[in-house]
Regions:
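Intrinsically disordered, glycine-rich low-complexity segments
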Residues: 8-20, 25
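Binuclear metal-dependent phosphoesterase catalytic core
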Residues: 62, 75-77, 283, 290-298, ...
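Active-site-proximal beta-strand elements of phosphoester/diester hydrolases
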Residues: 78-88, 190-199, 266-268, 321-324
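Core catalytic region of metal-dependent phosphoesterases/phosphodiesterases
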Residues: 84, 89-188, 281, 285-292, ...
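Active-site-proximal loop/helix segment associated with metal-binding centers of metalloenzymes
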Residues: 191-282
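Proline-aspartate-enriched helix->loop->beta-strand connector
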Residues: 262, 266-267, 300-301, 306
Length: 330
């Protein structure tokens, strides 16, 4: 056998040994797990960093190895939940460099976005950019959850099939990119989360234009010349940014079923009285802020997180406005 052939043979043997080690490690861990819990199963293996992930009854654990196959870290956990504010299709905050905590997360851990997700925006169908972004989020170790804001394409968002997830209704954009619908309560590791997306667009001084209006082009040109902000119906604005009576009533029913008590409330905008604290008369009250005021006055909760106003601020001990920060809540 010449030197080159010997080198190739040695590399092949190394690869086979590495694979045998992986198989042995996996079988050993599974055998140990089965002795403790017959229902444990491996649901993810990330070979690059030598991590095995397991789940059991919606609980999760991971075991991390060094290159010699020895255990260097073991974690058994309830789900971890982080929360952040408006993204507007800019998901750079979820890069590994900006959000290093994700290194130790799994699909049983969650990041919640408080509206203006922006991942479902293109007019008629998913664009190449959207597909790339949604696939990228779906590839993350964690699961992305979001309530809707006022900057979503509701024609497309509401066209996704309605599914049940953790006790509430959702739209699944990807298997681990999930829209939390309005008026729902989700149970995650014993924590109850009430969600209610939507808000009024307050940056439309020029009004809403109708594409089929005979004077559409003329009106648009005038508004552009005067730099007045406007929206175009079913292109950049949808009436569903504000809730329907049915959505509000469903929220009331679900809260009543939980004795009007939840751990967390996640919305896009906030209650009328809270909005006054934030901007005085800058923001107008509407059907949703008044509905959320009703919730605020009648529901027992620990923390309320919301976005929309593009700031990071503890309004009071219970209500937290969040924008670009990512904070852990569980």
């Amino acid at each position: 056998m010449d030197v080159e052939a010997a080198g190739r043979h040695e590399e092949v043997q190394k690869e086979r040994k590495k694979e045998r080690n992986w198989t042995l490690r996996e079988e050993t861990v599974l055998a140990r797990s089965k002795r403790a819990h017959q229902n444990w199963h491996c649901f993810f293996r990330q070979e690059i960093s030598s991590i095995l992930y397991y789940s059991y009854n919606d609980k999760a654990m991971y075991i991390k190895y060094n290159n010699r196959g020895s255990i260097i870290k073991k974690r058994s956990w309830d789900s971890v939940i982080y929360i952040t504010g408006d993204c507007h299709q800019d998901f750079r905050r979820f890069n590994m460099e900006s959000f290093p905590e994700q290194k130790e997360m799994s699909k049983e851990d969650y990041v919640i976005i408080c509206g203006d997700f922006g991942g479902v925006w293109n007019r008629n169908e998913e664009s190449k950019k959207e597909k790339s972004l949604m696939d990228w989020l779906d590839s993350k170790l964690f699961t992305t959850l979001f309530v809707d804001g006022n900057h979503e394409n509701f024609d497309r968002l509401y066209d996704y099939p309605v599914e049940e997830w953790h006790g509430g209704k959702v739209h699944k954009i990807r298997s681990s990119v999930i829209h939390l619908m309005r008026g729902q309560i989700y149970e995650i590791d014993g924590k109850s989360i009430f969600t209610f997306g939507g808000a009024s667009s307050h940056d439309i001084d020029g009004g809403i234009l109708e594409p089929d209006d005979p004077d559409y082009k003329k009106k648009k040109k005038e508004l552009d010349e005067w730099w007045r902000p406007y929206r175009i119906n079913h292109v950049s604005w949808w009436k569903q940014e504000l809730p329907s009576l049915e959505e509000m009533e469903e929220g009331r029913r679900n809260l009543a079923l939980h004795d009007n008590k939840v751990d967390f409330i996640v919305t896009h905008c906030c209650a009328t009285s809270t909005q006054i604290l934030l901007g005085g008369s800058m923001y107008k009250r509407d059907i949703e802020t008044d509905y959320l005021e009703e919730i605020r006055q009648n529901i027992s909760f620990n923390k309320w997180f919301f976005g929309h106003y593009h700031d990071n601020q503890n309004v009071n001990a219970e209500e937290i406005l969040i924008y670009e920060q990512i904070i852990r809540i569980v």
